[in-house]
Amino acid sequence: VALHRAAYQLYTHRKRLEHSGVLIVAPTRGFLRYIERVLPSLGETGVVTLTPGELVPGVRADTHDCEDVARVKGSLAMTKVLRRAVKARQQVPKGPIDLNIDGVHITLTPGDVRAARAEARATGRPHNHARTTFVRAALDRLVKAYVAELTRLERPWAEEDRADLLHDLRTNHDVKVALNRCWLPYSPQSFARSFFASTERLVHAAGEHISTREITLLHRPKDAEWTIEDVALLDEIAELLGDDDTAAQREQDKARTTERSNLEYAEKVLSMIDSEGIVSAAELAAQVGARRDSRTLAEKAAADRTWTYGHIVVDEAQELSPMMWRALMRRNPTKSFTIVGDGAQTSSISGADSWDHALSPFLEDRAS
């Protein structure tokens, strides 16, 4: 049924789906391998096939937690627990932090950090994105303290030096360590490993949302293998964190380097042929760059956790937990789904015994 529905969607809504594709989710890789063989033979290449344990790129989980742990991890209460856990990593120091800037001593105060944190949180952006605002706001306050101390020490400086002073602070080891301790960027995996390995952090994040027994069930070694239930939590954490801006900056730098390399290559090619009036070096470089990304739509979508699909087909859907449904709904905000399964046959303690129970948290806006 799932295979036929995917083929039907691709054929009937080809125009709408050619740039977004279809995601097929099934519990076993064996069934998905069959789909991967059949659909290309029908000329369909815009399909991504994933098990629930593969929803987050870079993570592949194929084992389940025990029933009690799976029930806790699959509960929507985890959204509140994880949100509290992320906010707890935006810390105000208990006391002032002394900083040495080329022999000039200044202080980062709890008040400075609290004000910078408030500015960052007010943006409403995910943790890693809001960190940019936090760092800027904290540095603005440190520059003022730095200037005041330079003035007190009667060291020469001018207003036009402020950008250089800001650079000195931004690159200073003490400053970087202090700001990282207050608001460190994380990947979903590094955050989850440290969070679930810490009883103290679990207790703080739990609040009134999960019980003491459930906290004990969630606690795990830092090097534990990912489970299928973890994948939905990693997806939620990724939403709360956002991309690491430092990693994004590295990608931008890499892209600029590649662009320069393409341009240099194009200029060399054009210098060897008579191309006047035909194509510019920049145009040729753009063509080279376009050719280098020869991935199919399915390959691009599978590598992008934030990809929005035109349609999602879910096989054995009764096995999915509320948190896994939340992860899937995120990948199709229009809620264009084909759901294949039987609630009476669920074998998962966190699965659905009725479709109303499984889907009502996500379909309130569609109620008639």
Provide a role label for each language-model segment:
Residues Y11-R14, P40, E44-V47, R83, ...:
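Non-catalytic alpha-helical coupling and interface elements of nucleotide-dependent molecular machines
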Residues H105-H311, L320-M324:
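Conserved helicase NTPase catalytic core signature
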Residues L3-K15:
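Walker A/P-loop NTP-binding motif
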Residues G43-P110, R117-A118, A137-A138:
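Conserved P-loop NTPase-based nucleic-acid remodeling module centered on helicase motor cores
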Residues K15, S20, R29-K73, L241-G242, ...:
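Conserved helicase motor core of SF1/SF2 NTP-dependent helicases
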